[in-house]
Amino acid sequence: MAVIRTTSRDIDLLARLMRAEAEGEGDLGMLMAGNVMVNRVRVGCLDFADINTVERMVFQSPGGFEATQKGYFYQRAREKERRLAQRIVNGERTHPAEFSLWFFRPDGPCPEQWYGQWNSGRYKAHCFFNPTSADCPEVYGVF
């Protein structure tokens, strides 16, 4: 069962963004990036209170994803990436990104906190950050 409402176009957008942000991290890295992306759509907290569609999440400004500013994002999604995106929409979650709303790629080690949000772990080059349950309880809810 889908955890957010999507169209075929949404799956394509999500797949392209997952690839553009995390292709170098392999399938698991793209799935983790996708966890963050879908979490931003499904919660109504912090910087994502008005982000209730995949398209709004993908093109959020300010505070969105840098990959949308690069040409690689605008290349057509491959079927493999579309399947990964559908798995995320269907509710697949992977630690350390299952409750994350942010990730980034630092030059060195992951900081313990990033803009007041706690580090939940690292996968290859990306560090993932979770909101506190006081700031965003719905990200921790069952769906």
Swiss-Prot record:
Its Gene Ontology molecular function terms? hydrolase activity
Its annotated compartments are:
Secreted
Q: Which Pfam families match?
A: Hydrolase_2
**Top-rank taxon, per record:** Bacteria
Where is it mainly found?
secreted
User: What are the record's GO terms for cellular component?
Assistant: extracellular region
> Which GO terms are recorded in the biological process aspect for this UniProt protein?
cell wall organization; sporulation resulting in formation of a cellular spore
Whether Ribosomal protein counts among this entry's keywords is no
Q: Alphabetically list the UniProt keywords.
A: Cell wall biogenesis/degradation, Germination, Hydrolase, Secreted, Sporulation
What does this gene product do? Probable spore cortex-lytic enzyme involved in the depolymerization of cortex peptidoglycan during germination.
Which family does this protein fall into?
A: Belongs to the CwlJ family.
Q: What is this protein called?
A: Cell wall hydrolase CwlJ
Query: What is the species of this protein?
Result: Halalkalibacterium halodurans (strain ATCC BAA-125 / DSM 18197 / FERM 7344 / JCM 9153 / C-125) (Bacillus halodurans)
Gene symbol? cwlJ
